[in-house]
Regions:
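Non-catalytic pre-domain segments flanking phosphatase-related domains
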Residues: 1-23
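Short coil/turn segments at beta-strand junctions that form active-site/ligand-binding loops
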Residues: 15-17, 60, 107-108
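Asp-based phosphoryl-transfer active-site loop
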Residues: 15-31, 122, 155
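Substrate-recognition element of Asp-dependent hydrolases with the DxDx(T/V) motif
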Residues: 26, 51-76, 85-86
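A positional/architectural concept
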Residues: 26-57
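Mg2+-dependent phosphoryl-transfer enzymes with acidic/Ser/Thr/Gly-rich catalytic loops
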Residues: 41-45, 84-85, 92-166
């Protein structure tokens, strides 16, 4: 894959039937606030939430696929009505199973991830997307580098571009 900020072709974008998101570093800015009792808090961008609503309205299937098992991920997925699979050290088998279950070819899917544990999923899909502030280890696997950072409008940017090219 090519390391580029270039938006994929309209033909490629029109083939996207599903979007799979990592959570930390995509829905969030990859930081966590930890209380003295160990409870974790993150900040998500409301514009990104609107982006997922727009994708849902366009009948794009969505999944949050997270290495961490965390109530924050479940809560955000529930609020946005997005299926969540979490607590998986190896994401690729889960991605493959989910795509098969939803009758979506890997080439008809986009994966948005930001770190080394997303690398195999990024390599597996038709459109590999990373936020601008993704870890350097995933840049070479990206077909599309967003201009926005994770947790700061990256999902909304993706949704707006995808849907404006349909």
């Amino acid at each position: 894959m090519t390391n580029t900020n270039k938006i994929p072709s309209t033909q490629t974008l029109n083939q996207i039937k599903a979007v799979i998101f990592d959570f930390d570093g995509v829905f969030t800015d990859n930081r966590v606030i930890v209380s003295t009792t160990g409870e974790e808090f993150v900040i998500c961008d409301r514009g990104d939430g609107m982006g997922t609503n727009l994708l849902a309205a366009a009948e794009i299937k969505m999944l949050i696929l997270s290495k961490e098992k965390n109530a924050v991920v479940s809560s955000r997925g529930k609020k946005l009505n997005i299926e969540v699979i979490q607590g998986c050290d190896d994401k690729l088998p889960e991605l493959i199973k989910w795509l098969q279950k939803n009758n979506v070819d890997a080439q008809q899917s986009a994966y948005i991830g930001n770190d080394i544990n997303d690398l195999e999923c990024l390599k597996h899909v038709g459109v590999a997307v990373i936020p601008a502030d993704a870890h350097h280890s995933v840049f070479d696997a990206a077909t599309w580098i967003l201009q926005h950072n994770g947790g700061r409008g990256a999902i909304r940017e993706f949704a707006d571009v995808l849907l404006s090219n349909r």
